[in-house]
């Protein structure tokens, strides 16, 4: 078995300075004029949606091939464009569409196959591959400066609220990603029984988690709950059984040929559960989500991640060793127990912050909407964009994290 220090992050498409984010800005525009139809329509999503002309324009769009996408950055840009066009087509009218036209479905399926990712709008489309800053050095720099200077390369609504919502998640990826090399060093230190290095890592990890909580706390600065709930969130929807708009259908039909043939597909909507970073934190601390549906859901969300990132998570599961090492140290022998507990509590606090966002941006606006219509909120109304029953899932994953804190403090 390879030593953890020999894990080649570059082979897993992971940056030492920005983690799962590319350490250079994604393309803002495809350089080949052949792809102008994709770029032009994506650049005008908001006015076309507002005028209810988007579906008509996309129905007239030519079917473009992907052979001119000769680099990974170009393929990622194409995937982002087509994902935004697909979501706008499906959810941009008063009545959701259940058919995706060939001009979107065919190239989206083909480029997704090359990228080894679902042919649907994922966390990667919304955050990892669609941000922009003026200078690449900002990506690995101060996370708050990165957040303040970031912009989106695509938008459904053209609002600051939408940009800020996605940018906060992207800034979390940038700040959290910097801890990945330290995780590998800590795993190696465990193998060498280097307690000081492990303790130093746990302290740094706790600080990192605190920084991520601070970033979440900034969501309210530029993202209003009413705008998120009514204007942004619909475009994050999936086509799974838990989506009321598609629960009585087979999902969405992807037209693949001029004769109208194709296939039905069901996919979960874009969700932070598709962030490789948070699952990596669970793996690092040995957090066990042992109830069947949670494990199945989190595993399913890995299939929505970029291929190399999910392979990295599988590799980390093989070599992760921090929790048993912490368990092996009694409170009188070192600070290991208290430092490990502090890191676990830091992850628990991060989940608390996320749950508070869900209440503020989804549960409360939905309750107000229901009350305005003289209706009571029901459990089926509390389904997340990823297709889960939000509150039970978030509470249980938070409680799973808290349950890991059973080591005695020194």
UniProtKB/Swiss-Prot annotation:
GO biological process assignments: 'de novo' NAD biosynthetic process from L-tryptophan; L-tryptophan catabolic process to kynurenine
EC number: 1.13.11.52
Keywords: Dioxygenase, Heme, Iron, Metal-binding, Oxidoreductase
GO CC aspect terms: cytoplasm
Requisite cofactors: heme
UniProt keyword Metal-binding present: yes
Source domain of life: Eukaryota
Keyword Oxidoreductase recorded: yes
SUPFAM superfamilies tied to this protein: Indolic compounds 2,3-dioxygenase-like
Associated pathway: Secondary metabolite biosynthesis
GO molecular function term, any single one: metal ion binding
Catalysis performed (reactions): D-tryptophan + O2 = N-formyl-D-kynurenine; L-tryptophan + O2 = N-formyl-L-kynurenine
List of residues binding heme: 309
UniProt family annotation: Belongs to the indoleamine 2,3-dioxygenase family.
Protein function: Indoleamine 2,3-dioxygenase; part of the gene cluster that mediates the biosynthesis of the benzazepine alkaloid nanangelenin A which contains an unprecedented 3,4-dihydro-1-benzazepine-2,5-dione-N-prenyl-N-acetoxy-anthranilamide scaffold. The first step of nanangelenin biosynthesis is catalyzed by the indoleamine 2,3-dioxygenase nanC which produces N-formyl-kynurenine through the catabolism of tryptophan. The two-module NRPS nanA then utilizes anthranilate (Ant) and L-kynurenine (L-Kyn) to assemble the dipeptide product nanangelenin B.
Alphabetized PANTHER family for the sequence: INDOLEAMINE 2,3-DIOXYGENASE
Record protein name field: Indoleamine 2,3-dioxygenase nanC
Organism: Aspergillus nanangensis
Taxonomic lineage of the native organism: Eukaryota, Fungi, Dikarya, Ascomycota, Pezizomycotina
Originating gene: nanC
């Amino acid at each position: 078995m390879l030593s953890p220090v020999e894990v080649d992050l570059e082979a897993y498409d992971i940056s030492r300075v920005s983690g799962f984010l590319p350490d250079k800005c994604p393309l803002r525009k495809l350089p080949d004029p052949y792809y102008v139809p994709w770029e032009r329509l994506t650049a005008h999503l908001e006015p076309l949606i507002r005028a209810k002309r988007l579906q008509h324009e996309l129905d007239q769009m030519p079917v473009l091939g992907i052979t001119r996408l000769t680099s990974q950055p170009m393929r990622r840009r194409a995937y982002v464009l087509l994902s935004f066009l697909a979501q706008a087509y499906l959810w941009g009218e008063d009545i959701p569409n259940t058919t995706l036209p060939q001009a979107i479905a065919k190239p989206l399926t083909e480029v997704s196959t090359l990228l080894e990712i679902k042919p649907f709008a994922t966390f990667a489309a919304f955050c990892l591959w669609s941000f922009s800053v003026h200078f690449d050095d900002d990506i690995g720099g101060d996370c708050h400066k990165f957040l303040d200077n970031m912009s989106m390369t695509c938008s459904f609504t053209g609002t600051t609220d939408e940009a800020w919502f996605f940018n906060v998640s992207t800034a979390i990826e940038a700040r959290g990603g910097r801890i990945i090399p330290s995780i590998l060093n800590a795993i190696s230190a465990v193998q060498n029984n280097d307690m000081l290095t492990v303790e130093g890592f746990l302290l740094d990890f706790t600080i990192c988690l605190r920084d991520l909580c601070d970033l979440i706390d900034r969501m309210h600065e530029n993202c209003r709950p009413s705008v998120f709930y009514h204007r942004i969130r619909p475009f994050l929807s999936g086509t799974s059984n838990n989506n009321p708009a598609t629960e009585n259908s087979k999902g969405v039909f992807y037209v693949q040929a001029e004769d109208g043939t194709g296939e039905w597909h069901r996919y979960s909507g874009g969700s932070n559960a598709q962030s490789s970073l948070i699952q990596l934190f669970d793996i690092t601390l040995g957090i066990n989500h042992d109830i069947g549906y949670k494990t199945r859901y989190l595993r399913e969300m890995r299939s929505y991640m970029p291929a190399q990132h999910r392979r990295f998570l599988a590799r980390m599961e093989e070599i992760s060793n921090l929790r048993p090492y912490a368990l092996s140290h009694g409170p009188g022998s070192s600070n290991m127990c208290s430092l490990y507990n502090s890191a676990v509590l830091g992850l628990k606090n991060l989940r608390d912050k996320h749950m508070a966002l869900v209440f503020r941006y989804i549960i409360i606006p939905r309750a107000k909407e229901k009350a305005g219509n003289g209706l009571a909120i029901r459990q089926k109304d509390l389904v997340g964009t990823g297709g889960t029953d939000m509150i039970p899932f978030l509470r249980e994953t938070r409680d799973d994290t808290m349950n890991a804190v059973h080591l005695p403090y020194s």
